[in-house]
């Protein structure tokens, strides 16, 4: 494998010319199919309309949507004009979206009507009341000075917002020469995507990724599984994470393969789509594969077309790995990394044993140096010696947006990114994650940062102290647990805490288990020992006869 210097838009043009009638995107459940040529034309129309809306190279386009067809359209349209797509988690509530819109300097926000109990329309009107009184194209928001447009992804009309249908019609009647001109100035090293990841400070940071970052990571991922133009990848993981928009999309676009999409995870839709489209590749976190295997209608579907896929996001039980191989005919691999590594650092291979794939994170990506260092001394660790996972290569982010201090904290002067994860390298060259220097919780593939939840809970006046940890869960990898001590004379119930969280922070961040304690285990220097809180939580649940789910 050699590295490529293409851009997202350039690769799309390549396949639209080389394989114009080859399917790029399929939504089996809504009978929607777009060839590379058709998709490229749609992208060009949206890109032209974005230029007309005043977007320039480097401007930020926010997208707050589940896996709807035009999610990918906006990604490629933004890329073609040199803009940066800022992905927004579909579970985010008002305060989280507000922070990202402001911090990212979003120029144009693209959104659907909502997701689950989350009404995006109400939230956006609440944040930007000017939408109801000002003309489209003349938005002047007091709260978001950089914001100039809001686009509704759909055909319904909302005051102050454009619709995708309107943008497509605009683009159809526009001269394409300005688009060609600006596209020719886009470099593979330009920023194309920005995703927010929380830090130990509790403040989310914008991870800036380039075309070069994500396309080479996607290409390597596809090569691990021997992708060709004949492959059909069923994607049910969210596009707003690197798993979806890099490991899936960029693996497809670098190999001329086909994306078979599901808007949001539903095991029945996944199985039906695999059956109908004869999908060859399937991605998911372990809980998704378990839900598919356990579905009562599983045996009604023919999934023998599957040959490989990725199971990532949290630790995979070896029993699940073996069932996926035997019952789904899917020789899955796993990928380890961070958003900051685009996200690939290491991966298992299809030739590895099920045990290796279930218990290790494999070997380094091509052209990526991986090493383990002693976090105290900075010296390289020997085989079998635990230390911090670090890497250097094309996969390293361009940095955190408007945060050079945090960038310098994670990328050292030699260009190595420090993951904060503890690991060991075995005698076969495979890496195994053994813990975290950071206290990040991974629940069902979602990264959760305790400090963010702790900061939010401290707003409850009854709380004196709160610490959030992850408790090992057989289903989700980890569950969120909160340990709370109350101020003298105050009372608070578990239900009070959950009610306070509900609707204000993303559902997956809400503590599943809440413990009220009088004092916290401390070190001699006065630091709280979170590992002892984890042990205490397990003891209290066992004593109460509660099994962690």
Language-model segments: which ranges?
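Gly/Ser/Thr-rich phosphate-binding loop
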Residues: 168-169, 276-284, 293-356, 369
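Conserved pre-ATP/AMP-binding loop-to-beta segment of ANL
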Residues: 20-23, 143-147, 151-158, 162-196, ...
């Amino acid at each position: 494998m050699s590295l490529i210097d293409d851009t997202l838009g350039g690769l799309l043009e390549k396949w639209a010319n080389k394989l114009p009638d080859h399917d790029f995107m399929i939504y089996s459940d809504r009978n929607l199919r777009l060839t590379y040529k058709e998709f490229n034309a749609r992208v060009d129309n949206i890109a032209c309309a974005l230029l007309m809306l005043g977007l320039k190279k480097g401007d930020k386009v926010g997208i707050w949507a589940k896996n709807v067809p035009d999610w990918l359209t906006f990604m490629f349209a933004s890329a073609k004009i040199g803009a940066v797509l800022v992905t927004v988690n579909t579970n985010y509530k008002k305060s989280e979206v507000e922070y990202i819109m402001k911090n990212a300097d979003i120029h144009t926000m693209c959104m659907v009507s909502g997701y689950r109990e989350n009404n995006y329309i109400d939230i956006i009107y609440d944040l930007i009341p000017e939408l109801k009184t000002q003309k489209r194209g003349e938005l002047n928001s007091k709260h978001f000075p950089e914001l100039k447009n809001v686009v509704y992804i759909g055909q319904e009309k909302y005051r102050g917002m454009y619709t995708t249908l309107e943008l497509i019609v605009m683009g159809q009647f526009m001269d394409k020469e300005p688009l060609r001109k600006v596209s020719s100035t886009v470099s593979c090293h330009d920023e194309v995507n920005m995703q927010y990841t929380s830090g130990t400070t509790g403040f989310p940071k914008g991870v800036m990724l380039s075309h070069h970052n994500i396309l080479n990571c996607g290409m390597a991922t596809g090569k691990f599984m021997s992708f060709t133009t004949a492959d059909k990848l069923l994607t049910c993981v969210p596009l707003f994470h690197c798993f979806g928009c890099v490991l899936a999309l960029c693996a497809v676009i670098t190999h001329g393969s086909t994306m078979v999409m599901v808007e949001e995870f539903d095991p029945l839709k996944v199985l039906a789509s695999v059956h109908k489209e004869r999908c060859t590749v399937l991605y998911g976190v372990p809980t998704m594969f378990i839900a598919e295997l356990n579905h009562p209608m599983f045996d009604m579907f023919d999934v023998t077309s599957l040959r490989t896929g990725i199971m990532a996001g949290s630790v995979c039980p070896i029993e699940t790995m073996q069932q996926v191989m035997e019952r789904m005919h899917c020789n899955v691999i796993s990928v380890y990394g961070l958003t900051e590594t685009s996200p690939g650092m290491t991966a298992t291979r299809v030739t590895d044993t099920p045990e290796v794939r279930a218990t290790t994170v494999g070997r380094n990506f091509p052209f990526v140096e991986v090493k383990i260092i002693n976090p105290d001394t900075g010296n390289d660790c020997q085989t079998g010696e635990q230390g911090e996972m670090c890497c250097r290569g094309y996969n390293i982010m361009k940095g955190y947006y408007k945060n050079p201090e945090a960038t310098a904290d994670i990328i050292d002067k030699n260009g190595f990114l420090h993951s904060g994860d503890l690991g060991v390298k075995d005698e076969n060259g495979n890496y195994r994650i053994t813990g975290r220097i950071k206290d990040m919780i991974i629940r069902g593939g979602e990264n959760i940062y305790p400090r963010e939840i702790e900061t939010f809970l401290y707003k409850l006046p009854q709380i004196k102290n709160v610490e959030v940890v992850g408790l090992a869960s057989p289903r989700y990898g980890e569950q969120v647990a909160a340990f709370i001590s109350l101020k003298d004379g105050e009372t608070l119930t578990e239900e009070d805490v959950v009610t306070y969280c509900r609707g204000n922070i993303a559902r997956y961040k809400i503590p599943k288990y809440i413990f009220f304690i009088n004092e916290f285990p401390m070190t001699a220097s006065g630091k709280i020992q979170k590992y002892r809180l984890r042990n205490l939580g397990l003891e209290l649940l066992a004593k109460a006869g509660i099994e962690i789910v």
